[in-house]
Amino acid sequence: MSDPIGVIHGRFQMLHLGHMEYLLAGKARCERLIIGISNPDATVTRFSSASPHRSLEEANPLTYFERYEMIRGSLLESGVSREEFDIVPFPVNCPELLFNYVPQKAKFYMTLYDQWSLEKKAMLEGLGCVVEVMWQRTDADRLTSGTEVRERIRSGQPWAHLVPPFVYQYMAQQGIDRRFREKA
């Protein structure tokens, strides 16, 4: 039996195929999936010693809206009905704000890769959330990373094979790939 509501979160600072595996695994576990975009803006982005690069400006080049559009378009492209998911801000670094965006009584789905993942899991459990770990892997087991995709775009290397088709098209149509290269 699936959960009525599930919550999943990430920065999605380049929605890639690893993210899609994560999102679709979460959706398979619930009737309605709420996708939280962490670091939605600079006002709620904080430093964490467990993952210092996540708070850097160069690690957060996409706006909340751009990430929202890429997630929405890619899920629709994957056959998920629009009625089955919502996308909201998820200020993970300001836990006191989380329940303004997501229901505390939902099931929170996570994957564990590193110390930062473990810290977030402990934080959510400390807030009284029920957390389900979908899988635990090492960084070496990742399909790809947002960092890798961003670096490939900036350096002119092939990257379309690392992202959903919608993301590749959206990046080109909006000139985001060009913006990345110009800032390199």
Predicted segments, located by residue:
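Nucleotidyltransferase catalytic core that binds NTPs
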Residues: M1-A184
